Amino acid sequence: VLQLFSDKLGVRPIYYWCDEEMVVFATALRVLEALPFVPKVRDDAGVAETIAFGYPLAERTQYLGVSVMREAEIVRFSSLGNTRTCYWRWDQVPTQEMTDSDAVKEAYEVFTDTINIRRRDDKEVGAFLSGGMDSRAIVAVLNESGASVQTINFSPDRSQDQALARAYAERIGIPFLSAPRKRNPKDGFRVALTRFVRNCIDRGEIKADRPNGLWSGDGGSVGVGNVHLDDKLLELLRNGDRRSAIKHFFRISQIGFPYRLLKPEDRKLVAETFYTGVENELDRHECADPGQSMFLFLMVNDQRKHLYDVYEDLDLHRLEYQLPFFDSRFLEFICGLPVDYRNNHRFYTDWFSVFPETTRMVPWQTYPEHVECPLSIPEDLSYQWGPPPAQTFTAKVSSRISSGFEALGLALNPADLGPVPRSRLLALAGIQLLAIKDYSYAVKAAARYRSG
């Protein structure tokens, strides 16, 4: 008998594949990909979901037969058969009856406890610090606990993320290490961040008892601030208009797909896959409030897979994050609060009122259409969710031509592209090579279907 267990939210991935003779499991998908006896048959639904959502839903991966464990799951393999069970249900967390004042105070106590448990006896700690609320909440508690905190910032120059983080670090008198980056690093934000941090550690620039265990605010904006939810979405769900609710969710979360890339007969099928996938996930949660079901959809899909790229390469970069916002006791407390109160950072903003006073003496960056920071922010700073800076003509043309060659390579490669016709890729290649319009997003989507 073999049993695999995942953590309560499934934040650390465990992939598995089995046939009648063996079970193969690993914490990195690339391990299974490297094994010749594990079939690599593309799952078109998994690929389409990755393009639209950024990740496959549920236990799906991009390969048929290869699964990833869900939240709080036990998968049991035996000669009598395989079973999957849950040892914890997030939808069974009861709603707490308490005043808003008591809620913010108790949340602060629980959050402080989660940080102290993870800090152990460390005197010096390293923590990421951006211009937002999540990392500031962590740094504020660490600093209040008496730890010597060195902060690390990896944001573009003259951005709110950089300037507000620096101002807060200076306000409470702690070191601030900043490495300005491009708005969109070529190899992705997470890879670029990991490389920067690894280099800093290897050069001895991060003064911490456990420099490989940096504190990170991942999980705060969705878990506490209800990002990707709004009041209209809750209203639609409670009125039973689930399809309209999902459509609204796709809009506010900017979830889309380049349907014109596909054959006409496949477009409706793919679109229906997205709606059905979300509906199936909502049906898993037996919540009295349909709004809570959508929150849990985000937690056990978007947030569960939020740090997969970090944990899958743990053996390569050797970085282990401290993630108090993913603490199960803290999340259980947050789940017990009314979802309306948590929406749009309403609870989060009230929660800030019980943090040390210095936490609120420097402005912080907020999400669009969420509760605004009461302090004024310099207008000359770039905003994370604002329009991207304009490219130079040369950079724009160069980028499109590069994408055109990629499209041409895909079209001429004999590898299977599933529902993507080669004729469309050739047309895309022509448009991109002539720099007529930017369809690089469609080229990247087509590349995900490539197999072989």
What are these regions (language model features)?
Residues 3, 11-14, 18-21, 79-81, ...:
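ATP-dependent adenylate-handling active sites, centered on carboxylate activation for C-N bond formation
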Residues 2-98:
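N-terminal segments that mediate ammonia production and transfer
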Residues 30-31, 156-157, 367:
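Short beta-alpha junction loops
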Residues 357-437:
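PAPS-dependent sulfotransferase catalytic core
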Residues 28, 43, 262-263, 418-421:
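Helix N-cap / beta->alpha transition motif
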